[in-house]
Design a protein with these regions (language model features):
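Hydrophobic faces of well-ordered beta-strands that scaffold small-molecule active sites
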Residues: 5-9, 53-55, 84-88, 137-139, ...
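Active-site beta->alpha N-cap acidic-glycine motif
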Residues: 1-80
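Active-site-adjacent pocket scaffolds in enzyme catalytic domains
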Residues: 140-235
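Histidine/acidic-residue-rich catalytic or RNA/ligand-binding cores of hydrolases
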Residues: 95-98, 174-177, 248-257
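C-terminal domain-boundary segment and adjacent tail
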Residues: 215-322
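The substrate-binding groove and active-site-proximal loops of carbohydrate-active enzymes
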Residues: 25-33, 56-64, 106-115, 137, ...
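Metal-dependent polysaccharide deacetylase catalytic core of the NodB/CE4 family, i.e.
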Residues: 56-145, 242, 250
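Short loop/turn segments at strand-loop or loop-helix junctions that form parts
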Residues: 7-19, 58, 88-91, 198-203, ...
């Protein structure tokens, strides 16, 4: 049995660049192609290692900046042979270009009632398809801010997968599943409705605290160990998170060498482990055993200490403005 690897990249306009009053071309550049390590670079690395990745694209900025930037994202991804699925940050619903971010809708999808969430998902789906994407079958809420109303709406709309549950950010991820749930599952309320939850993979950081399997959150060694653990323990799937802008500093004008090295190491590791840990698109609909009791990688103080030292360098040196 193999372990399915979902390498997911949330692809969006960074709100901070909109709030800074930048024009749409500069927002695109700093969010999608920052410092030469954005979409183009990431797609090239994926191709070099013959890996599959899912790009969760948020089309909602089209409400104020038009559909062309979203079409550009979608075509770049699809032309590279990768997959586009739906991401949604509802703050863009009441945003105004050039107002410094003062106007905005609610930032968390889960702050809306079920009917409003459904309407937002329908609206976002229509925008994504208008931008040239196939009709999405997988979804991730912005900031993982989904709840059971989100799952109800997705099931009703015919989605096959949600990947919003993240036990490491339980303050915003409100799906009623255990924090340590990392195996694919159909929540009881969704039995027979066709929607499978694919949780984001987490590892144990300290007693009672979890950390996301994400480029900016774990060192290369920790990520590799988490993948090895998943294979050795016979996990059904691992779900890795990154962002289109994550390999650059927050200003989007300088590459973060720590994060770039982590991405390159992750791609090399997934390439080397492809027989046991094949990367998948959600559109592949890989067979997934449901309800398995997969456990996060246990904490390791040495790995944690090494990562904290690396993080300190990343935050103090690599995050400097270019």
């Amino acid at each position: 049995m193999t372990t399915a690897a979902f390498l997911t990249i949330d692809t969006e306009f960074a709100w901070r660049h909109h709030a800074a009053g930048l024009d749409v071309e500069e927002i695109y550049a700093r969010s999608l192609e920052p410092a030469g390590v954005g979409l183009g670079y990431q797609l090239a690395e994926l191709a070099r290692h013959d890996l599959k990745a899912c790009f969760f694209v948020d089309p909602m900025p089209a409400l104020l900046y038009g559909i062309d930037p979203i079409r550009r994202m979608v075509s770049t991804i699809l032309d590279a042979g990768q997959e586009v699925q739906l991401h949604l940050h509802p703050a863009w619903t009441d945003a105004v270009a050039g107002d410094g971010g003062r106007g905005h809708g609610r930032f968390d999808l889960s702050d809306h009632d079920r009917a409003t969430q459904r309407a937002l998902i329908v609206r976002a789906t229509d925008l994504l398809v208008a931008a040239g994407a196939p009709h999405p079958i997988a979804f991730r809420a912005g900031s993982y801010a989904a709840n059971d109303h989100t799952l109800d709406a997705l099931a009703e709309l015919g989605f096959a997968f949600d990947s919003s549950h993240n036990g490491a950010v339980f303050g915003s991820s409100h799906i009623m599943l255990p924090k340590r749930q990392i195996a694919p599952i159909v929540p009881l309320r969704l039995a027979g409705r066709g929607l499978v939850e694919i949780p984001v993979t987490v590892v144990e950081d300290t007693p009672g605290r979890l950390r996301t399997l994400q480029l900016c959150a774990l060192s290369s060694g920790e990520s590799r160990r988490a993948l090895e653990h998943a294979v050795a323990a016979g996990h059904v799937a691992v779900t890795i998170v990154s962002h289109g802008f994550e390999l650059a500093n927050r200003q989007g004008n300088r590459a973060n060498a720590v994060h770039v090295r982590r991405f390159e190491a992750l791609c090399a590791t997934l390439d080397a482990m492809r027989d046991a840990l094949p990367t998948c698109h959600f559109g592949d609909r890989p067979p997934l055993a449901l309800g398995q009791d997969d456990r996060p990688l246990a904490r390791d103080p040495i790995r944690r200490g090494l990562r904290q030292a690396e993080q300190l360098w990343s935050n103090w040196v690599e995050e400097r403005a270019g």
